[in-house]
Amino acid sequence: MAHKKGTGSTRNGRDSNSQRLGVKRYGGQVVKAGNILVRQRGSKFHAGNNVGVGKDYTLFALVEGMVTFERKGKSRKKVSVYPLAQEANVAVDQA
């Protein structure tokens, strides 16, 4: 029987927290101003109409409206938010 404890491995046992990146609001969803649309590293998605860019490349809505994902040239993707018509806003508020 051993009379000393095993020391175990000191080189393992670390892991980083997940970054929780990705698309947060999908095409066709209605968003409010300030809602985060995409969390990303670098500009995988580019800002389109009514979309702002944070210092960490987070895309967020500048106006209330509907999210659309569009192509910008052959390879670039852009995210835009288009305002809803006034009649549609009234219908959403009453629902």
UniProtKB/Swiss-Prot annotation:
Q: What Pfam families has UniProt attached to this entry? A: Ribosomal_L27 (PF01016)
Which SUPFAM superfamilies does the record cross-reference, listed alphabetically?
Answer: Ribosomal L27 protein-like
Note the InterPro entries from the entry. Answer: Ribosomal_bL27, Ribosomal_bL27_CS
Q: Which GO terms describe its cellular component?
A: cytosolic large ribosomal subunit
Task: Enumerate the Gene Ontology biological process terms.
Answer: translation
Q: Which domain of life is it from?
A: Bacteria
Q: Which family does it belong to?
A: Belongs to the bacterial ribosomal protein bL27 family.
Q: Which NCBIfam families match?
A: L27
Any idea what this protein is called?
A: Large ribosomal subunit protein bL27
What is the source species?
Trichodesmium erythraeum (strain IMS101)
